[in-house]
Amino acid sequence: MNKNIKLILSIFTLLVAVSTSGCIDQTEENSSQDNAIVVAVSILPQQEFVEKIAGDRVNVVVLIPPGASPATHEPTTGQLRDVADARAYFTVGSGLPFENVWLEKIETINEDMLIVDCSEGIQIIEMHEEEHEEEQNAEENEAEAGHDHGGVDPHVWTSPMNAKIMVENTYLGLIEIDPDNSEFYLQNKEAYLKELDEADATIRDTLGEEGGSFMTYHPSWNYFATEYGLDMITIEEEGKEPSPRDMQRLIDEAEEKNIKVIFVQAQFSTQSAEAIASEIGGEVVTVDPLAKDYIDNLAIITEAFSHGITKE
């Protein structure tokens, strides 16, 4: 009997110890989360940039969620409430339509928040002159539709070399609001920059140096194309569907260059792309420039482009 009582007491003591340990671990985890700095970003790729540098020392508020378009998204009440607690807002800063519309309004919600322009130091690509003229002629309509890029291409992050600059700017913002962790941020930033260099090398090895052409519905890939010597042919221009004459021109160009893949993204209509693909005996392939897992997504994009680019 005494042996049974001792056994029961031993088991009870063990259970109490495990339970107490679990409570302590949970308390420490909750405390870590409670002490994390709140920062805001515009797009999902930036979430990886911040988290790779700062780890669990930050909570990231992403203002444009998965599946939403930077041209039309409006922040929710909950997002704006979170921004009110943010120490910093890391903007893309290159004419992103969402920021053009909402940045000043967001600043009024939290006047003490540090605003970091992550495109500082990046050479911004101007739109083609004819595109800019179209924009000026229909400025009011395009602004209402959310497609006013202010004459520049906002998709700077699609080039991993530009992403490195964005990461540097993110790091500088983080050490400004949290200098006590600057060494931790520096080590993580340097490690992530090496990952981006490795991704860039893989892209160059995969795509080669011969150049080539590809066709895409929305002009999201200009910086990627420029980085790797590619010619991007765009179906949509400044938020407008192609006219019948433009459709025929695109079909003729695709046939001339033996293009068999039309790239689209989930945030936009695929109707025109599917019509062109049908005419040229090609296929429509979805690639997402706004995916959260930036480096993993670069590998997916590169694989897709390696099959969709036609060499000169």
Question: Can you say where each PLM-predicted feature lies in the sequence?
Answer:
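Extracytoplasmic metal-acquisition and chelation regions
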Residues: C23-E312
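Secretory targeting signatures
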Residues: M1-S31
